[in-house]
Design a protein with these regions (language model features):
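Short, cationic-aromatic polyanion-contact patches
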Residues: 1-2, 49-59
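Short, leucine-enriched amphipathic alpha-helices that occur as contiguous helical runs
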Residues: 1-9, 31
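Short acidic, hydrophobic short linear motifs in intrinsically disordered regions
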Residues: 16-26
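Glycine-centered, phosphate/nucleic-acid-interacting loop/turn motifs that mediate DNA/RNA or nucleotide
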Residues: 45
Length: 59
């Protein structure tokens, strides 16, 4: 799980992305697990979600 977090953060350093794009860049096979991890990271303040654009970005 720690490796998945690192993969997500490195993917977001390139540019903000939608969930499916993040899954491809971070090499995560399960969309549900990816969304769950993103929500946990959002609660911790590591990432933000722009509701108007539908993009995840580094917090």
């Amino acid at each position: 799980m720690l490796k998945d977090r690192e993969n997500i953060l490195s993917a977001l350093r390139e540019k903000p992305a939608k969930t499916y794009q993040l899954m491809r860049r971070a090499n995560l096979p399960n969309e549900e697990a990816c969304q769950s991890l993103l929500l946990k990271m959002r609660d911790e303040g590591l990432v933000k979600f722009d509701i108007h654009k539908g993009l995840w970005e580094i917090g």
